Amino acid sequence: MAACTARRALAVGSRWWSRSLTGARWPRPLCAAAGAGAFSPASTTTTRRHLSSRNRPEGKVLETVGVFEVPKQNGKYETGQLFLHSIFGYRGVVLFPWQARLYDRDVASAAPEKAENPAGHGSKEVKGKTHTYYQVLIDARDCPHISQRSQTEAVTFLANHDDSRALYAIPGLDYVSHEDILPYTSTDQVPIQHELFERFLLYDQTKAPPFVARETLRAWQEKNHPWLELSDVHRETTENIRVTVIPFYMGMREAQNSHVYWWRYCIRLENLDSDVVQLRERHWRIFSLSGTLETVRGRGVVGREPVLSKEQPAFQYSSHVSLQASSGHMWGTFRFERPDGSHFDVRIPPFSLESNKDEKTPPSGLHW
């Protein structure tokens, strides 16, 4: 757990995982450097892929940690399913699924764009489609390898005490889309190193996968459901840069005789082209139900100006926003720079900030 510090951004490594597995024969051995978190598919009859020297610690050798399974085209992965993240490259385990509404503006029916309006920016109407995401634990051994490129993911909560702005985090907890999961099996009874793994999951060799939910996991999920729930996902692509936004409601606090509502939002930027680009600026418009419209401009995101290349095509981070109203909207643009110095703007899909008006008190810590 100590290896996964409570930071809120996650840079992404190469896409070579998904490329190297295309057309593969299943099952395939899954290998890692002993004590390390970087993986490589083991050899087949035609190809052999090893860890690169930049990722493999000096003196470490590859060892088999599991066998890849065929990814599910239909249906859901069960609690206890081990997986490799196809984009981030970390080992993880599925805790439970979320059924989200995916609003994908790339597949929306072509409609005349409308002028921007304070309710959230006009543009084409998008219908939500049900899509499966998963709450997962990240293997602590892999966090240092992710953080070589950026920072590791954590889920943040409002602290339940006098400081209305205080946050606490659960490191190594993430949300993963169904298509990002590369499932594998392992004979290890504790294949994932995370402080919560053995608290949440019990080894049962008669089951498939051989890890079942403990009562502590079910109780924790029920207790913290309002603050963990993933309901809406928004996605849009501009000039081969895809932006995915997932908002989460965190709760309400009273400050100076007024109510302050808090949200967390997670953003993933993906370069779908081979050209190298760098994020330079962000430009946000934040509309509150109270009638205020705020503009926020700044350099980069979370103190970084990430480069998106063919080798490292994606970057993910989380941030927070508060309003003195129970709902609102956010939208905006990211400005990217090409190697020749030219710039282009990438749209951030508009998303709603909705609160739960019959909410209970947000959690003050880990509830079992």
UniProtKB/Swiss-Prot annotation:
Name of the featured protein: Polymerase delta-interacting protein 2
Keywords: DNA damage, DNA repair, Mitochondrion, Nucleus, Phosphoprotein, Transit peptide
One GO term describing the cellular component: nucleus
Protein's job: Involved in DNA damage tolerance by regulating translesion synthesis (TLS) of templates carrying DNA damage lesions such as 8oxoG and abasic sites. May act by stimulating activity of DNA polymerases involved in TLS, such as PRIMPOL and polymerase delta (POLD1).
Transit peptide: 1-51
Transmembrane regions: none
InterPro entries from the UniProt entry: ApaG_domain, ApaG_sf, Hemimethylated_DNA-bd_dom, Hemimethylated_DNA-bd_sf
GO biological process: error-free translesion synthesis; mitochondrion organization; mitotic spindle assembly; negative regulation of macroautophagy; positive regulation of focal adhesion assembly; positive regulation of mitotic cell cycle; positive regulation of mitotic cytokinesis; vascular associated smooth muscle cell proliferation
Natural source organism: Homo sapiens (Human)
Keyword Magnesium: no
Record-listed Phosphothreonine modification sites: T292
NCBIfam families found in the cross-reference section: PRK05461.1 (NF003967)
Assembly and binders: Interacts with PCNA and POLD2. Interacts with SSBP1. Interacts with PRIMPOL; leading to enhance DNA polymerase activity of PRIMPOL. Interacts with POLH. Interacts with POLD1; leading to stimulate DNA polymerase activity of POLD1.
Protein localization: Mitochondrion matrix; Nucleus
An annotated Gene Ontology molecular function: DNA binding
